[in-house]
Amino acid sequence: MRARGLTELRNAAVEPEIMDLVDVLQKMGAIISVDTDRTIHVEGVDELCGYTHSALPDRIEAASWASAALATRGDVFVRGAHQSHMTTFLNTFRKVGGAFDVTDEGIRFYHSGGDLSSIVVETNVHPGFMTDWQQPLVVALTQAQGLSIVHETVYENRFGFTGALRKMGATIQVYRECLGGTECRFGQRNFYHSAVISGPTPLTGADIVVPDLRGGFSHLIAALTAEGTSRVEGVNLIDRGYEHFMSKLESLNAAVTRLA
């Protein structure tokens, strides 16, 4: 912003959060524009000023709670969730068997009753299906009828979290091949980037160690879905991306206790 002359960022991300940052910088006095080819142009200015701005709600967290509602046959209202930022997820959620009601205040996500349906999902950059949406959804797909396929095209080796799900009784196999119908850059690079989920399978409680942020929340969803008691270690990793998640779980009447 303060550099002299024109700065050009090519192949830039254009997710809603990035565009929201562009709005903030413009409010602060920046001269910044975004082209349709994902090029961001920034003209240097002498100074930036203060601003007032309401940050976007977290669409990853919203989708995580939606997947939890689907897996547990529950009902949750996510205050502040934006329909326009979650179009691809909402279409997938509905195809699997979830239902949602959009209001000015947020989105209500709930299980519509009956059996969940299997689906093929491929992750992609915005406006595609976010890579951070797939882990929570995989838990819900363990409860769907038939074979579901999730093809990860954004990051390699994102299915490590499925080991704990298999320990709980899920039938999930991971593959190096591209199984979603589209060849991606990981197809010939020996990465496990496709998963086949067979369901429905009852899950049972287990002792789990959280591997990372998104995988960890997915394990919480699995624990809520499972019969019996689960012990999930390393939940401090989840705090990083899910603010006050324990109080939110308690507000949903989840039988959960944090030991440390």
What are these regions (language model features)?
Residues M1-A260:
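Short, structured segments at the rim of ligand-binding sites
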